[in-house]
Amino acid sequence: MDMLTWAALSADEQKTALQRSPLIGDSGLEQSVRAIVDAVASRGDAAIKEFNQKFDGARLANISSANSDNLRLSEHEIEAASARVSPELKAAIAQAMANIDVFHSAQQFRPIDIETQAGVRCELRSEPIEKVGLYIPGGSAPLISTVLMLALPATIAGCEQRVLVSPPPINDAIVYAANVCGITEIYQVGGAQAIAALAFGTETIPSVDKIFGPGNRYVTEAKRLVSQDGRCTVSIDMPAGPSEVLVIADSDANAQFIAADLLSQAEHGPDSQVILVTDSLPLAQAVNQALKSQLAALPRQEIAATALKGSRTILVKDMQEAALVSNRYGPEHLIIQTRFPREVLNNIRAAGSVFLGAYTPESVGDYASGTNHVLPTYGYSRAVSSLSLADFSRRFTVQELSAKGLLGLGQAVMTLASNELLDAHKNAVAVRLASLKG
């Protein structure tokens, strides 16, 4: 990776050093996705089946003829798919589920009920989102962990209807993971058409209140479009971008560990970005050597090598400056491999998820430590939080005033309303005060 010295860079050069690769897209993307969304909104299941055949035709041929035209998996199909999953994988899923359950169950909302002044009672309450849609991408590698990260919190939160969609044929492990997480509605549909179905509903697929899950640029664009479409009322989880990691390391860090962590993100895709920030030139050089040897053994070495071309090492004077660089970048994943990692953590202000110490690879958070791996990317961690139980609920406030409360607060409200030239607001208080004063 290219090596830069932070203190030697101008302000503009520092900004360039922390730039990400441009998001891949084309001028026709919105038009293409909008056509799919509109077709599903107007023609429902018929459009879904046409797009399934068009985009997933080869894979549809692998589905049993008895169900090749059915969008929803039957209870029998769910049981059969689950039976084909190996005991070893089931055990791994169970261990990951247990940790995710513990961490997310601890996030249960605690209501606030307080008197702000005499006779003025204010509350903050929370209720689960009634209907949620979970999108799980297809492809050669089943994203089992993503099912756990979405389905389990939705179940813990108490969402009444939990719908999962994934391109056909859905991998057995995906079906099993969904089932053990309490998902009983599983539909064979992927891509932009799946997002549109969740937003508008079809004859078979119910509309939902919020859509979660990663996907390719068509899925990402569809999520953006439906969240802004006046024909439906649906929200989405968070903006999506390429995967990324920033590693803060000092001279005590293990170069082999760091190289492995960098490559574990680089192999996600050619637009992934990895950054090493260190105050040790010998360590930086050792990491570069370790990258070369480990890269040669990777099946996805071409993808990882392309990602490394857009990545870099940044040399800093100390760990305080390292934290400053990290905060300006706002990484999706932040790994801190230093002698005193928690001291560095105290200076961190922006990160999707943080991994402390030599024995905490980013992979554990991806799969089974208990934290959620759905994280803000592309610098959004400076303002957007990682996925949590709160994302599957909505909060609302309650206020209740007694007569004494209104007498004590009314004049302030009327004064503010008058200054904002909102006389009806003022009058709503005035008529009540008049009735109290007889």
Swiss-Prot record:
Covalent S-S links between cysteines: none
Binding site for NAD(+): Y135, Q193, N216
Catalysis performed (reactions): L-histidinol + 2 NAD(+) + H2O = L-histidine + 2 NADH + 3 H(+)
Coiled-coil parts of chain: none
CC terms in the record's Gene Ontology section: cytoplasm; cytosol
GO BP annotations listed: L-histidine biosynthetic process
Known EC number: 1.1.1.23
Pathway: Amino-acid biosynthesis; L-histidine biosynthesis; L-histidine from 5-phospho-alpha-D-ribose 1-diphosphate: step 9/9
Function: Catalyzes the sequential NAD-dependent oxidations of L-histidinol to L-histidinaldehyde and then to L-histidine.
Name under which the protein is recorded: Histidinol dehydrogenase
Gene: hisD
